[in-house]
C-alpha cells in the first residue's frame, strides 16, 4: 500500500452513539469534500452541511471540518465528517466515499504513521496517542499526555544533543593529535561523559516508572488448596471476584483481576491449588497455574498459617520452591493470622519477604499492597512523568551499555576511535526511541497496534 493513497476510516468506536466521525487524509480529500458536501468548507471552521450520495440525495447531515495540509494532524489534507453515530448511517457514508477513485480504507494506525512520516510527531509521541487511549488510570493518562506533548522526547533529544557535542570533541582530539593539549587525557571528555551517563541514568529511572505505569505488574497467587488464595484475591480486588468455600480445590481455573495501587496497574492472578490432581479438569487447572507462575513478575506464596509454623519457603514446601524459575521474586504470605494470633506485618526470611495477614478479615492486606508497590520501585509522586514502553527501556539500556564501554575505552587505553564508535552506537540507540533511526519493520509493528482511525 502506498503512502500517496488517500485513506478513510471511522475515527469513533464501532457501535451506536450520539456522534460518528469519518476521517479522510490525502491528496483526494478535497475531491471527497466537493463530492459529498458540494463545496470545500472554510479551513478550520465547523460547517453544518448535508452529506450527499452520488445521486444528490442526503445520507445524513452533520459537521464538516476541513484542515488543508500541511497544517493538519497528518500533515496532509484532512477532512472530518461528524454525523450521527448509527452504524448503518456511517456504513452508507463510508461506502459513498469509497466509490470515489483513489480512496481506500486506512490500515490500523495509518493516520498516526503519516503524521510521523510528515514530521508532525516523533515516534515516541505517536506511541503516546495509543497509550493515552489505552490508559487505565488517571495517572497513566496524565503521563501519556505528557509524552504526547513531548516530555519524553525532549529528554531523549537532550541526551542525543549532548552526545553530539561530545562526539565532536572526541573527533577533534582524534583528528588533531599533534596539538599541545591531549584532549583525551585532560579530564574534560571524561567529565562530559560522566555527565551524560548521569543524565541517562535519570531518564532510565523515570522510564522504568513510566513502564510500570503502562505495563503494570503481574502477580500470581500460588500455593496448596485451601490456603486462602481466592480470599486474598477478593481482599486485594475489593470485591467478591472468586468463589470461596471450605472445600479444597474450589478454584479449578485461572482467575484474573486488574486493580490499581496508587496508580500502578496490578494484574492479580488466582490459580488452582497445587497438589496431585484428582481428575483431568484439576490437572489442566494446575498446569495452567504453573504456566502463569513462569510468566509472573512476582509470586505470592500463600501459606495456611494453621498448618505449619515454618516461615522459610524452602522449608515449607521445598519441591515447590525448586520448580520456580530462577530469580523469580517470592513473597511468602502467611494467612489466617486472625486464627493463629500471629503479629501482623512484614519481615525478611532468607532473602524473601514474609507478610503475615488475614485474607478473610482484611487485616494486614494494606501491608501487602505497600510491599507490592515498593518491590517494583514504584513512585507515586510522578508529576511531569511520562509513559515508556519496553522497547524504550531496551534502547535506553543499550545506550547506557555503550557509554560504559566507551568510558572503559577512554580510561583503559585512551582509545579515541573506540570511544567515538561507542558514542555513535549510544546515539543510534537513543534515536530509535524518537524514530530518527528506526527500521521499517519496527514502524510496521508499532503502528499496526493502533486503532483503525488513529
Swiss-Prot record:
Q: Name one GO biological process term.
A: tRNA wobble uridine modification
Q: Which GO terms describe its cellular component?
A: cytosol
For this chain's record, the cofactor binding note is: Binds 1 potassium ion per subunit.
Which residues make up the binding site for GTP?
226-231, 245-251, 270-273, 335-338, 358-360
**EC id:** 3.6.-.-
Which SUPFAM superfamilies has this protein been placed in? Answer: P-loop containing nucleoside triphosphate hydrolases, TrmE connector domain
**InterPro entries according to UniProt:** G_TrmE, GTP-bd, GTP-bd_TrmE_N, GTPase_MnmE, MnmE_dom2, MnmE_helical, P-loop_NTPase, Small_GTP-bd
Cofactor(s), names only, from the UniProt record: K(+)
Q: Where in the cell is it found?
A: Cytoplasm
Q: State where it is primarily located.
A: cytoplasm
Database matches in Pfam families: MMR_HSR1 (PF01926), MnmE_helical (PF12631), TrmE_N (PF10396)
Query: Which GO MF terms are attached to this record?
Result: GTP binding; GTPase activity; metal ion binding
At the top level, the lineage of the source is Bacteria
Cite the entry's keywords alphabetically.
Answer: Cytoplasm, GTP-binding, Hydrolase, Magnesium, Metal-binding, Nucleotide-binding, Potassium, tRNA processing
* Residue ranges occupied by any TrmE-type G domain in the UniProt entry: 216-377
**What residues bind Mg(2+), as annotated?**
230, 251
The residues that hold (6S)-5-formyl-5,6,7,8-tetrahydrofolate are 23, 80, 120, 454
Q: Which residues bind K(+)?
A: 226, 245, 247, 250
Give the family, as the similarity comment puts it.
Belongs to the TRAFAC class TrmE-Era-EngA-EngB-Septin-like GTPase superfamily. TrmE GTPase family.
Role according to the record:
Exhibits a very high intrinsic GTPase hydrolysis rate. Involved in the addition of a carboxymethylaminomethyl (cmnm) group at the wobble position (U34) of certain tRNAs, forming tRNA-cmnm(5)s(2)U34.
Subunit text: Homodimer. Heterotetramer of two MnmE and two MnmG subunits.
Q: HAMAP family under this entry?
A: GTPase_MnmE
Name listed for the protein in its UniProt record: tRNA modification GTPase MnmE
Which species expresses this protein natively?
Answer: Citrobacter koseri (strain ATCC BAA-895 / CDC 4225-83 / SGSC4696)
Which gene codes for it? mnmE
Amino acid at each position: 500500500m502506498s503512502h500517496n493513497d488517500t485513506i478513510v476510516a471511522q475515527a469513533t468506536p464501532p457501535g451506536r452513539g450520539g456522534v460518528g466521525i469519518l476521517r479522510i487524509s490525502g491528496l483526494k480529500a478535497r475531491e471527497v469534500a466537493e463530492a459529498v458536501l458540494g463545496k470545500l468548507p472554510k479551513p478550520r471552521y465547523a460547517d453544518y452541511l448535508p452529506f450527499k450520495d452520488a445521486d444528490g440525495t442526503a445520507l445524513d447531515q452533520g459537521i464538516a471540518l476541513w484542515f488543508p495540509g500541511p497544517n493538519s494532524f497528518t500533515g496532509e489534507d484532512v477532512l472530518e465528517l461528524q454525523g450521527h453515530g448509527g452504524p448503518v448511517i456511517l456504513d452508507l457514508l463510508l461506502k459513498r466515499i469509497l466509490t470515489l477513485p483513489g480512496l481506500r480504507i486506512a490500515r490500523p494506525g495509518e493516520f498516526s504513521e503519516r503524521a510521523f512520516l510528515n514530521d508532525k510527531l516523533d515516534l515516541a509521541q505517536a506511541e503516546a496517542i495509543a497509550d493515552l487511549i489505552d490508559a487505565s488510570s488517571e495517572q497513566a493518562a496524565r503521563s501519556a499526555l505528557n509524552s504526547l506533548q513531548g516530555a519524553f522526547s525532549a529528554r531523549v533529544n537532550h541526551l542525543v544533543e549532548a552526545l553530539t557535542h561530545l562526539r565532536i570533541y572526541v573527533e577533534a582530539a582524534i583528528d588533531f593529535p599533534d596539538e599541545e593539549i591531549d584532549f583525551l587525557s585532560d579530564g574534560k571528555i571524561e567529565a562530559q561523559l560522566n555527565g551524560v551517563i548521569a543524565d541517562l541514568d535519570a531518564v532510565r529511572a523515570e522510564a522504568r516508572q513510566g513502564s510500570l505505569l503502562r505495563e503494570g505488574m503481574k502477580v500470581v497467587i500460588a500455593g496448596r488448596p485451601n490456603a486462602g488464595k481466592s480470599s486474598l484475591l477478593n481482599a486485594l480486588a475489593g470485591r467478591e471476584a472468586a468463589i470461596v468455600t471450605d472445600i479444597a480445590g474450589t478454584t479449578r481455573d485461572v482467575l484474573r483481576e486488574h486493580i490499581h495501587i496508587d496508580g500502578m496497574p496490578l494484574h492479580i492472578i488466582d490459580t488452582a491449588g497445587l497438589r496431585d490432581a484428582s481428575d483431568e479438569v484439576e490437572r489442566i487447572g494446575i498446569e495452567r497455574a504453573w504456566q502463569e507462575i513462569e510468566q509472573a513478575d512476582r509470586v505470592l506464596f500463600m501459606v495456611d498459617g494453621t498448618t505449619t509454623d515454618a516461615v522459610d519457603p524452602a522449608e515449607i514446601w521445598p519441591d515447590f520452591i525448586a520448580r520456580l524459575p530462577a530469580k523469580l521474586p517470592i513473597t511468602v504470605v502467611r494467612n489466617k493470622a486472625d486464627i493463629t494470633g500471629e503479629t501482623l506485618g512484614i519481615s525478611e526470611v532468607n532473602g524473601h519477604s514474609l507478610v503475615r495477614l488475614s485474607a478473610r478479615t482484611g487485616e494486614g492486606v494494606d501491608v501487602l499492597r505497600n510491599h507490592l508497590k515498593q518491590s517494583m520501585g514504584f513512585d507515586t509522586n510522578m508529576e511531569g512523568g511520562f509513559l515508556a514502553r519496553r522497547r524504550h527501556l531496551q534502547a535506553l539500556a543499550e545506550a547506557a551499555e555503550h557509554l560504559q564501554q566507551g568510558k572503559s575505552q577512554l580510561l583503559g587505553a585512551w582509545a579515541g576511535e573506540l570511544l567515538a564508535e561507542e558514542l555513535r552506537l549510544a546515539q543510534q540507540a537513543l534515536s530509535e526511541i524518537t524514530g530518527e533511526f528506526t527500521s521499517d519493520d519496527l514502524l510496521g509493528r508499532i503502528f499496526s497496534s493502533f486503532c483503525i482511525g488513529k
